């Protein structure tokens, strides 16, 4: 017997943190080779939508709303696996990425390498077409 989404989330024993007055947790998405694609926040509703649809949904703290990854660009993230960290306040999602993950056109949002001697950064990733 399959459980409903709320019961699944309850069984995950997550610790949503109070961030800007919202109950959120960190979501990290990687490809199947564990290359980090992006990080974002999730609230309970975005986690529910992700579980129900099989595609990543996040909570935007700047826009104060739920969003489905790729809703405008078509660059969706299909969920393959999910892992809970030891504290229960972060989730790691393995996803099948369509197109690029970064809104700037890079596969990963982590394409700026920082020089710790100067604090300046250099773009190390290539933009995708």
From Swiss-Prot:
GO terms for cellular component: cytoplasm. This is Phosphoribosyl-AMP cyclohydrolase. One of its GO terms (biological process) is L-histidine biosynthetic process. Mg(2+) binds at residues 85, 87, 89. Homodimer. Catalyzes the hydrolysis of the adenine ring of phosphoribosyl-AMP. Keywords: Amino-acid biosynthesis, Cytoplasm, Histidine biosynthesis, Hydrolase, Magnesium, Metal-binding, Zinc. GO terms for molecular function: magnesium ion binding; phosphoribosyl-AMP cyclohydrolase activity; zinc ion binding. Zn(2+) binds at residues 86, 102, 109. NCBIfam families: PRK00051.1 (NF000768). The gene is hisI. Belongs to the PRA-CH family. It is found in: Cytoplasm. It comes from Methanococcus maripaludis (strain C7 / ATCC BAA-1331). Its main location: cytoplasm. It catalyses: 1-(5-phospho-beta-D-ribosyl)-5'-AMP + H2O = 1-(5-phospho-beta-D-ribosyl)-5-[(5-phospho-beta-D-ribosylamino)methylideneamino]imidazole-4-carboxamide. InterPro entries: PRA-CH (IPR026660), PRib_AMP_CycHydrolase_dom (IPR002496), PRib_AMP_CycHydrolase_sf (IPR038019). Its EC number is 3.5.4.19. Its cofactor is Mg(2+); Zn(2+). Pathway: Amino-acid biosynthesis; L-histidine biosynthesis; L-histidine from 5-phospho-alpha-D-ribose 1-diphosphate: step 3/9. Binds 1 Mg(2+) ion per subunit. Binds 1 zinc ion per subunit.
């Amino acid at each position: 017997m399959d459980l409903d989404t709320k019961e699944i989330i309850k069984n995950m024993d997550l610790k949503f943190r109070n961030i800007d007055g919202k109950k959120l947790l960190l979501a990290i998405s990687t490809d199947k080779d564990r290359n980090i694609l992006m990080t974002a926040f999730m609230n309970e509703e975005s986690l529910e939508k992700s579980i129900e649809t099989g595609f990543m949904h996040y909570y935007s703290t700047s826009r104060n709303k739920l969003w489905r990854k790729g809703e405008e660009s078509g660059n969706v993230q299909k969920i393959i696996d999910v892992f809970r960290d030891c504290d229960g306040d972060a989730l790691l999602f393995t996803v099948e990425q369509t197109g690029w993950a970064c809104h700037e056109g890079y596969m990963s949002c982590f394409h700026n390498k920082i020089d710790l001697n100067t604090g300046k950064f250099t773009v190390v990733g290539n933009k995708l077409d």
